[in-house]
């Protein structure tokens, strides 16, 4: 139930639920799966496990994009300025490399003087001033995701579709954008190698966004 999921996430975040119990839960999700309602409740509980941003006072509609990543993925660096130049505010928090793929932050940090560690206020100020902000993820946003991801990484449960979807979207929901563009890469060199699995993930993430009252489009 929603109450049970919220209790579990609160316990994981506070440390009241030990790692071995959380790991067993993650393995149960991998083996048994979760339905769309359960996955959405998990995503929302993770999103509200820490601080959340309210961007509505800066702009009524803001967008964010997420790519599941792959070799040579640099879409963020071109898509964000193009969208912002059309007058639609873009507020994005990016991540680092996962496995063998290079993350957006890793690429940006190769530019001398570029800062990715913006404070919450700097993030909001830049969005208000320029209509575009790109920063690293704050540790205060969706802290439950950080704990669960670390456990998934060492327990062989990284590939669970409900856990992947909840991990991606909990951070996005916490960051406050009203609409998302999701880019699910597939094939050799991508995080999701099999197209069938990529399509399943994309449909699940679209459903979660719809059930969370967010506008979304997903490309595979």
In which residue ranges do the predicted regions lie?
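Acidic, glycine/proline-rich low-complexity segments that act as flexible tails and inter-domain linkers
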Residues: 1-72
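General beta-strand structural signal in soluble alpha/beta enzymes
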Residues: 64, 90-94, 116-119, 134-137, ...
């Amino acid at each position: 139930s929603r109450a049970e999921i919220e209790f579990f996430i609160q316990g994981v975040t506070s440390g009241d639920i030990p790692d071995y119990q959380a790991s067993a839960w993650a393995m149960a999700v991998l083996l048994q799966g979760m339905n769309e309602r359960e996955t959405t409740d998990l995503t929302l509980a993770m999103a509200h496990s820490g601080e959340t941003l309210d961007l509505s006072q800066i702009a009524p509609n803001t967008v964010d994009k997420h790519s599941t990543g792959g070799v040579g993925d640099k879409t963020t660096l071109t898509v964000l300025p193009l969208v912002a130049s059309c007058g639609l505010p873009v507020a994005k928090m990016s991540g680092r490399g996962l496995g063998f793929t290079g993350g957006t932050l890793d690429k940006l940090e190769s530019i001398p003087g570029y800062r990715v560690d913006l404070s919450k206020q700097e993030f909001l100020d830049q969005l208000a001033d320029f209509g575009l902000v790109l920063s690293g993820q704050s540790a205060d946003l969706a802290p439950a995701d950080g704990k669960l991801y670390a456990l998934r990484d060492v327990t062989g449960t990284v590939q669970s579709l409900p856990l992947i979807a909840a991990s991606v979207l909990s951070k996005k929901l916490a960051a406050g954008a009203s609409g998302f563009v999701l880019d699910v890469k597939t094939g050799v060199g991508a995080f999701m190698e099999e197209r069938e699995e990529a399509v399943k993930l994309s449909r699940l993430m679209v459903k979660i966004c719809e059930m969370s009252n967010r506008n979304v489009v997903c490309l595979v």
